[in-house]
A protein has these predicted regions:
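N-terminal domain-onset segments
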Residues: 1-47
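Short, compact, well-ordered microdomains
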Residues: 49-84
Length: 84
């Protein structure tokens, strides 16, 4: 058995606050549904639609895979740090 480490990659991400105006234009094609009354956003991912709740999820853009997907805040903050 060998040990492996994930390769470092840079991503684009934002903490979803429920406002469509915050989304970069190129991410809009990944939106399946937006529930304006709750601010919940559903994005199209390789595994199917995924929900992002305001203040509970970051949205991450993996444009190499042509996808934008939500990640729970606690998981995001464990895995990522800001770059210059």
């Amino acid at each position: 058995v060998k040990r492996y480490r994930a390769k470092p990659i840079e991503i684009e991400a934002l903490l979803w606050q429920g406002d469509m105006a915050d989304l970069p234009q190129e991410w809009l094609t990944h939106v399946v549904t937006y529930e304006g009354d709750t601010g919940v956003l559903f994005t199209k991912t390789l595994q199917g639609p995924a929900a992002a709740e305001p203040g509970q999820h970051y949205l991450i853009a993996n444009l190499d895979e042509n996808e934008v997907y939500p990640v729970v805040v606690s998981v995001f903050e464990r895995r990522y740090e800001a770059v210059a």
